C-alpha cells in the first residue's frame, strides 16, 4: 500500500513539475492569430469568432451515430435468433437515415 501511495505522489509531483516547466518555458506571443483556434483551414478572424462549417458538424454527428449503431449490431449479432427482427429494424433505421441525408443533400461536401 505504501508503494502505491509513493507512486501516486511521485506521479503527481512529476506532473506538477512538467506543468510548471511548460508554463515557464513556453513562448508568450499573444497575437490574435496565436490565441485563436485553427479550424481546418478556415480563417476564424473577423466579426464572428465562432465560425465553423456545418458540414464538419454533420459529418461528425453521422460518425458518432453510425459508430454507436455498429456497436449495437455487435450486441445483436451475438444474441439469440429471436433478435433477428430487431436487427432488421435497426438496419432499416440506418438505411432510412442515410437515405434521408442523401435526399436532403447533406452528404454533398461544400466548403
From Swiss-Prot:
Its EC number is 7.1.1.2. It is a multi-pass membrane protein. It comes from the Eukaryota. The chain crosses the membrane at residues 1-21, 56-76, 84-104. Keywords: Electron transport, Membrane, Mitochondrion, NAD, Respiratory chain, Translocase, Transmembrane, Transmembrane helix, Transport, Ubiquinone. InterPro entries: NADH_UbQ/plastoQ_OxRdtase_su3 (IPR000440), NDAH_ubi_oxred_su3_sf (IPR038430). GO terms for cellular component: mitochondrial membrane; NADH dehydrogenase complex. It is found in: Mitochondrion membrane. One of its GO terms (molecular function) is NADH dehydrogenase (ubiquinone) activity. Its main location: mitochondrion. It holds the Pfam family Oxidored_q4. It catalyses: a ubiquinone + NADH + 5 H(+)(in) = a ubiquinol + NAD(+) + 4 H(+)(out). Belongs to the complex I subunit 3 family. PANTHER family: NADH-UBIQUINONE OXIDOREDUCTASE CHAIN 3. Core subunit of the mitochondrial membrane respiratory chain NADH dehydrogenase (Complex I) that is believed to belong to the minimal assembly required for catalysis. Complex I functions in the transfer of electrons from NADH to the respiratory chain. The immediate electron acceptor for the enzyme is believed to be ubiquinone. This is NADH-ubiquinone oxidoreductase chain 3. It comes from Ascaris suum. The lineage of its organism: Eukaryota, Metazoa, Ecdysozoa, Nematoda, Chromadorea.
Amino acid at each position: 500500500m505504501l508503494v502505491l501511495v509513493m507512486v501516486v505522489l511521485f506521479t503527481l509531483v512529476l506532473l506538477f513539475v512538467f506543468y510548471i516547466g511548460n508554463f515557464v518555458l513556453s513562448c508568450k506571443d499573444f497575437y490574435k492569430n496565436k490565441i485563436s483556434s485553427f479550424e481546418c483551414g478556415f480563417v476564424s478572424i473577423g466579426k464572428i469568432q465562432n465560425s465553423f462549417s456545418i458540414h464538419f458538424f454533420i459529418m461528425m454527428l453521422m460518425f458518432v451515430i453510425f459508430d454507436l449503431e455498429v456497436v449495437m449490431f455487435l450486441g445483436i449479432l451475438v444474441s439469440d435468433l429471436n433478435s433477428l427482427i430487431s436487427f432488421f429494424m435497426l438496419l432499416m433505421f440506418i438505411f432510412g437515415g442515410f437515405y434521408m441525408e442523401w435526399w436532403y443533400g447533406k452528404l454533398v461536401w461544400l466548403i
